[in-house]
Amino acid sequence: MSEQQTMSELKQQALVDINEANDERALQEVKVKYLGKKGSVSGLMKLMKDLPNEEKPAFGQKVNELRQTIQNELDERQQMLVKEKLNKQLAEETVDVSLPGRHIEIGSKHPLTRTIEEIEDLFLGLGYEIVNGYEVEQDHYNFEMLNLPKSHPARDMQDSFYITDEILLRTHTSPVQARTMESRHGQGPVKIICPGKVYRRDSDDATHSHQFTQIEGLVVDKNVKMSDLKGTLELLAKKLFGADREIRLRPSYFPFTEPSVEVDVSCFKCKGKGCNVCKHTGWIEILGAGMVHPNVLEMAGFDSSEYSGFAFGMGPDRIAMLKYGIEDIRHFYTNDVRFLDQFKAVEDRGDM
């Protein structure tokens, strides 16, 4: 058998073996069989010793060409095996996107959170700044800076959680206003709202809680008038309860404002005709307000002959109870999913 015939048969057999290799391990064995140090192609070089010198270069070239041909076939088969393996893996891991996905329960904002954010958004649009303060407060800022000295009889109006004689849980967010006025007097107008939790020694029932939320507002500037306060409160009432709402101001008393008023809104359920919500009066009380007392301005460093201001305070708990017909304030704090899920449905309808 000639060398040419031997190489031709070797090539054909190598191609058959390569095509029959069904995995990378089998293909590696074929490579060793033909191209390894002791492989068939390497063995052809042993035939060169029996060839005339003038034929050796041509023979060596043909052996190298055969080696390259087999290597190319091996590389091609290798790529094919890798592709087949990947396709098989993809087929096994295929996700049927036509199937319905897993239902993921999505929560919703707590009704108090939504009410607070609604109020905050309104006042941010009016140029107010949101200021937060300490929940553990000094008696000085919680009472004395608000025209409530230790001897003032109005202190009996609200029982407090005292930690020491001078430290307590704040009973309102008014200390934030006092601290802000004290730190900013002489720096221009003050225009802030102060949301947060407050604490009072009340027995928990349907309308009272030892912990609840409050939002207070404060404006201090030159020539601030009662009419400015009334216009602000009218806008607030329409935003919270509907564009056709009206407000009513009734004289009242707060130590830190003078004059002081209670603010009522026309009943959004009966349109002022009288119902169980408004106790058949046509009006619902929503907040307290007034012009900042000159003593409060002076204690904070403002000249009360030059500056004036108004303040107001409301309970988002009460606002939310009125808006959504909630009869017991304790529902807000008991984490009852059955209660909270009702507001998820309202939110989905876009009513909140």
Curated annotation (Swiss-Prot):
Subcellular localization, as worded in the UniProt entry: Cytoplasm
Membrane-spanning segments: none
Enzyme class name: ligase
Gene Ontology cellular component annotations, sorted alphabetically: cytoplasm
Known EC number: 6.1.1.20
Keyword Aminoacyl-tRNA synthetase included in the entry's annotation: yes
InterPro entries: aa-tRNA-synth_II (IPR006195), aa-tRNA-synth_II/BPL/LPL (IPR045864), Phe-tRNA-synth_IIc_asu (IPR004529), Phe-tRNA_ligase_II_N (IPR004188), Phe_tRNA_ligase_alpha1_bac (IPR022911), Phenylalanyl-tRNA_Synthase (IPR002319), tRNA-bd_arm (IPR010978)
Gene Ontology terms for molecular function: ATP binding; catalytic activity, acting on a protein; magnesium ion binding; phenylalanine-tRNA ligase activity; transferase activity; tRNA binding
Keyword presence, Ligase: yes
Record: residues binding Mg(2+): 258
Cofactor(s) it depends on: Mg(2+)
Gene Ontology BP annotations: phenylalanyl-tRNA aminoacylation
Reaction catalysis annotation: tRNA(Phe) + L-phenylalanine + ATP = L-phenylalanyl-tRNA(Phe) + AMP + diphosphate + H(+)
SUPFAM superfamilies linked to this entry: Class II aaRS and biotin synthetases, tRNA-binding arm
Pfam families: Phe_tRNA-synt_N, tRNA-synt_2d
Family: Belongs to the class-II aminoacyl-tRNA synthetase family. Phe-tRNA synthetase alpha subunit type 1 subfamily.
HAMAP family: Phe_tRNA_synth_alpha1 (MF_00281)
Subunit structure comment from the entry: Tetramer of two alpha and two beta subunits.
Protein name: Phenylalanine--tRNA ligase alpha subunit
